[in-house]
Amino acid sequence: MKNGGKASFKGYLKWILISYLAMAVILFLQNKLIFDLSISFLAIIIPFALCSIIYGVTHFSKKYITLGGASIALYVVIMIVCSPLVSYKAHRELLGNVEEVEFSSQIKHIDLKQLPTIDKELADKLADKKLGEIPSLGSQVYVGDLTLQSINGELYYVAPLEHSSLFKWITNHKGTPGYVKVSATNQNDVQLVTELNGEPLNIKYLESSYLLTNLDRAAFLRDMKAAHTDYTFELDDEGKPYWVITRYDTGVGVTEKKAIGALIIDAQTGESEIYDIDNMPKWVDRIQPDRFIKNYIDKWGTLVHGVFNFSDKDKLVSTEGMNLIYNNDECYYYTGITSVGNDEGLVGFTLTNTRDGKTTMYKTAGATESAAMKSAEGKVQQYKYTATFPYLINIQNEPTYFMTLKDANGLVKNYAMVNVKNYNTVAVGDSLQATLNKYLEVLTNTNISLEGSDSAKTVEGEIERVGLVIKEGSSIYDIKLKNDNNIYSVSTETAREVSLSKPGDKVKIEYMNVGDSRYIIVNSFENANTSSKDKNDLKKEEKKVNEEVKVE
């Protein structure tokens, strides 16, 4: 018919059905066909609007053009209503209730043996080196994306072996022969796992696979009721490989994204199970994608007084980086919080549980991660080492940035600890214990209180030997007690009376039980001999004053 013919509802309906069918086919082939109205809202509106307008134009029908325009207008209105312009409180509440607590009340004290000294970049190199030890295997596969996780209380980077090409996938139809584990605390602990319980591993469901074993397609075919993101390769406590895939829905009307659970797929067999957040297996470390949490934190901080807060009153924003930290075997996202307009000054930091998304705010003024990195690099500027992004730790109730210092080849050369509250309080060493000892000395010499720690110990005894050491202008007395192999280091900043101590004096020492070193940093020192002398001198002075008063 000329110019499309006469418009009819039946003909229009055919256009609509064909357009939706075409859209469904396209989305299906892209593994994005989701049976959820809120997530698929845009995919519903676009075909309807375009089809209505095109049909109206080709059939000279204003009502269909108007209908298409009205649907676009409806979409715009709904998006505005769901945007922060109107629903700023709903956007700010995406993060949930943010609890404010003291740093020392929840963060576990440092355990040097569990402190991650290997970052992802170095772990990648170690994994590639391990794979390269088997030339025949290295030509068939490559190491996938490494993810940090806790396995039976120990931190490892884990990644599957991926097919290196389509041809390799065809020839290795049973799957790749295992996965790689790289310890985050010991660079000598790198494992290529090809067997489990005496049985060979065959990882079939991978991002590098094709057709029905392609990971994205496999997830889509097993769950079309929610959108998927954050495909994470994780091991259960027995070392069995799985894919943990975040399921999400819309968070505010038809906008934003909110994690609702996970689809867990056996990487070998393809068997799957859908879990809500509340009934997730304990071995799963992460459900909440880091970009979701970053977005929530920024909305929570910037929308404190709505969108039209042009004076930036009380506005907060997260710092550039985000890191994973483990506390009591729970996984958290860490990020610093700054005031808008003050990029280098920290007002606190947040820890967000990577499973349930619960966030805790720790208010403390201090330095940002970037400022701490520059401070650590400044200590060894002659070597031009670069600092890795900091890992937040608790050293004697003091929030502390820990980082490694690497050379131009990416090799770890030093370790650094920087106090969050004062980034000038920094220590650098060539071993973890040496760095910790230096850091504790610096804390003591800067009069930062280290009392009240749950790892504090007390010892009493008689001095056997005492010696003086000058470190960076500070007087440090090393004391050995009888029948005690430890060496107790006492700064004159901690106790002036230590300079009067001598062998044979009875002393009481409080110290931090941190690490395995024989040399121990003391945070409280009492000498019974000098203290008793001080008391006698005080009594004599009081008696003299009283006599003078009587005379008057």
Range-by-range predicted roles:
Residues N3-E552:
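Soluble extracytoplasmic regions of secretory-pathway and membrane proteins
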